């Protein structure tokens, strides 16, 4: 019976120390969150520039509610596409150098929309083994032939491409890998696309806002500005709006005809109520702050360097220069115990366990922000050093 299966599945998950519970946050004060009556310094948030607490962005959202109401009321293609959606799409496209952008309610939805709307049976999809779950799910659902290459191994990827017989080839990768914090080789991936007439889809959820001189993400970080038609025609680029941008949603940028095709064929875009218009107003304000946010990014870089320098056991650290700083533990139960010890000391650092990461690679994922205080980073590092000693 299905009821027995549910009980057995839950019991099995609990026995492996993989059972998850929702943490209810009752209040937020900058980097501090209130959980179960205890104030904790939050080192789990993807709000890398602290913009979710920015007053200008908050005021833009409030003004958007006054102008357009609390909700869109319809899908984009019916009567839910407002001027603020249109304006922020044009703003991001101009900032990035793409011809057109499209607003989605979430990054997961955007990835499903792109892969499901553009890739089909008979195509070949090449995915990094550590890609986000949404990319993996979408690739399988596309019914294309899916190849998975070893993490960041472009030689392995090229061998796969050479062996593939499919006509249309797609390379799909995270920009910044969410569990390890390392960065894709954009120049290398683009070179393979040109060499083998392939297309490149990049999910830069954790790169946009923090990478590049003007915060424009992994392409700017790698000096791969997409002004040439040669590059632009091959790249589709997704950024989320709930991490560094500090609001909610996602946008996909590409050549105009590609985005136009998504509007025609992408079911996750067509068959859902449009994102709240006021959020688009907040995103627009945030994009301006990000473009001129060199000081925020410098502060974040200093915080990352301070944290890595302060951890005594360097073997715990991965090779990450980004705000995502995993501490490799291995055993899931041990990771939970350490996370609880940090919580008792006033810090919220989640234990990341399978199936989010491979078996025996459980970790603590420290997420740093430009708004973290030096004293809090040093205190956290000191507690980690004591617990891991």
Which role does the model predict for each range below?
Residues 75-81, 89-113:
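Short loop-beta-helix segment that forms the pyridoxal 5′-phosphate
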Residues 55, 59-63, 67, 94, ...:
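PLP-dependent enzyme catalytic core of the Aspartate aminotransferase-like
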Residues 2, 7-8, 12-68, 198:
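N-terminal "arm"/small-domain region of PLP-dependent enzymes with the aminotransferase-like
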Residues 274-293, 299, 303:
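Structural motif of enzymes handling amino- and sulfur-group chemistry
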Residues 114-133:
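Conserved PLP-anchoring active-site segment centered on the Schiff-base-forming lysine
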Residues 214, 220, 226-261:
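Active-site PLP attachment segment
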Residues 299-305, 314-346, 356, 368-370:
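Conserved PLP-binding catalytic core of the aspartate aminotransferase-like
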Residues 47, 147-202:
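Active-site phosphate-binding strand-loop segment of PLP-dependent enzymes
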């Amino acid at each position: 019976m299905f009821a027995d299966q549910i009980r057995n599945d839950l019991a099995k998950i609990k026995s492996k120390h993989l059972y998850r519970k929702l943490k209810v946050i009752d209040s937020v004060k900058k980097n501090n969150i209130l959980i179960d009556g205890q104030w904790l310094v939050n080192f789990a948030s993807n709000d890398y520039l602290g913009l979710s607490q920015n007053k200008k962005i908050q005021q833009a959202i409030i003004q958007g509610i006054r102008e357009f109401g609390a909700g869109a009321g319809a899908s984009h293609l019916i009567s839910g596409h407002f001027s603020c959606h249109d304006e922020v799409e044009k703003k991001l496209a101009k900032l990035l150098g793409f011809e057109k952008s499209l607003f989605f309610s979430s990054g997961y939805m955007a990835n499903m929309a792109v892969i499901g709307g553009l890739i089909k049976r008979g195509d070949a999809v090449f995915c990094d083994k550590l890609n986000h779950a949404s990319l993996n799910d979408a690739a399988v659902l596309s019914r294309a032939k899916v190849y998975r290459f070893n993490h960041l191994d472009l030689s392995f990827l090229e061998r796969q491409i050479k062996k593939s017989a499919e006509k249309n080839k797609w390379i799909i990768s995270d920009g910044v890998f969410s569990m390890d914090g390392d960065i894709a080789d954009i120049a290398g991936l683009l070179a393979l696309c040109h060499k083998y007439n392939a297309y490149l889809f990049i999910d830069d959820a954790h790169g946009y806002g923090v990478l590049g001189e003007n915060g424009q993400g992994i392409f700017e970080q790698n000096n791969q500005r997409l002004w040439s038609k040669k590059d632009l025609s091959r790249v589709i680029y997704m950024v989320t709006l709930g991490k560094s941008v500090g609001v909610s949603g996602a946008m996909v940028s590409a050549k105009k005809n590609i985005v136009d095709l998504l509007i025609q064929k992408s079911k996750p875009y067509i068959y859902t109520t449009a994102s709240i218009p006021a959020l688009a107003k907040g995103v627009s304000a945030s994009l301006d702050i990000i473009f001129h946010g060199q000081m925020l990014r410098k502060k974040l870089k200093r915080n990352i360097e301070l944290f890595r320098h302060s951890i005594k056991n360097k073997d715990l650290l991965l090779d990450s220069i980004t705000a995502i700083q995993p501490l490799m533990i291995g055993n899931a139960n041990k990771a939970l115990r350490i996370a609880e010890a940090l919580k008792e000391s006033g810090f919220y650092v989640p234990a990341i366990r399978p199936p989010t990461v491979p078996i025996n690679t459980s970790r603590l994922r420290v997420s740093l922000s430009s708004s973290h205080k030096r004293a809090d980073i040093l205190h956290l590092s000191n507690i980690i050093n004591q617990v891991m000693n």
